[in-house]
Amino acid sequence: MRVLSDQITMQPNKQNQSTFFDLAIAKRGSSNHVLATINRVVNFTEAEQLVAATYGKGGRPACRVGVLLRVMILQHLYGLSDPQAEEQLKDRLSFQKFVQLDAQEAVPDETTICRFRQRLIECGLHEKLLGLLNTQLEKRGYIVKRTTLVDATLVESSRKRPDVKAAAEGRAPDADASYTRKYNRSFYGYKAHISSDAKHHLIRTAVVSTAKAQDCHLFEQIAPADTKEIYGDKAYDTKANKAWMRKHRIRNGIEKKGAYHIKLTDWDRRNNRRKRRVRTHIERIFAHLKKWQFYRKVRYLGLVRNQLELTLKAVAYNLKRLAGIMQMQAK
C-alpha cells in the first residue's frame, strides 16, 4: 500500500535525491518488524494532508509533516517523552526508517515535536486521526462492526493531588482532574472510556473525562450507532442508555443491575455471566495500554491535552495490534 507522499508536505520532493546512505538504511531491518509492517500496510497520506493544510501557503513546519506524525506514533508505542523521542531517533535506525527520515534531514528536536502536538490540539485534528485510521482498517476487514464492547478505566493525574505548596511555588495545578473512590480507595485523576470491536479487539472510539464522571453518562459518546450489539458492565445499565440502543436498533448486551427493591433472578445472573464472558476482552486493551504504553498516569494537564494523548495511544495500539494480526495470519 502506498505510503506518505512528499508532495503534500509543502517541501521539495526528495524522491530523486536518495544518497548511498539512504539506500543502505533502506536495506536494514527485518521485514516482519512491527514498524516495518505498519509502514508497509498503512497509508498516512490523508492524515498528512489534513495537518499540512493547516499551515497554509505562508508557513511550514520545521520538519516534514509526515515525519512528525510518525514521531507522535513512536512516542505512544514506546512511552517516549519529547526529549527521549529526539534521543532515540538519533540512535535507532529502525526509528529513522519508520519516520522516513532522509540522511540529509536533521532529527526533529523536542521543541519541534512539542509545537507540532500543540498544533494538532489547536486545530482539533486529534479528533479525526483515529477515525482516518479506522476507515482503512474497516476497508481491509479488520474492524467488524457487528459486536462492540465498551468500558472505562481510571488513570492517575500527573499531579498527585491539589497541593497548596506546589501552587505557591508556581507549579500549575491540574484543574480538570477530580477525586473519586474505587475499592474504598481515594483516586485523583481522569477516566479513559473506549469502545472496541469484539473480533479483533481494535479501538473504535476513545474519550477522556474527569475521574468523577459516571460511565453511563459517556455511553452515547463512545458507543457507535452503526453496530448491531453492545456489551458492557452494569455501570451502563440505565434507562437512558437502553432507550438509546432501542432508538438505533442495537441489541442490548449490557449486564443487568439489581437494586434493593429489584432482585436479580437466577436467569438474570446466568445471562450476566454470559455477557461478562464477551465483554471482559476489552479489559485486555486497558491492560496493554497501561503495561506496554505506560498509561497508568497521564502525561499532561487538562482534558484537551489528555484527550490527544489517549487518541494517539489508541492509534498506536491499533497499529501494533494490526501488525500482530497480520503476522499471525502469515503463519
What kind of region is each of these model predictions?
Residues P83, E87-K90, Q100-Q104, P108-H248:
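Polybasic low-complexity intrinsically disordered regions
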Residues M1-T45, I325-K331:
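Charged, often Cys/His-bearing segments associated with DNA-binding zinc-finger transcription factors
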Residues N43, R60-V67, E105-P108, R274, ...:
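Secondary-structure capping and boundary motifs in well-ordered enzyme cores
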Residues E309-K313, K320, G324-K331:
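C-terminal domain-tail junction helix/linker
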Residues R28-I73, L77:
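Basic, short loop/linker segments at the boundary and entry of helix-turn-helix/winged-helix-like folds
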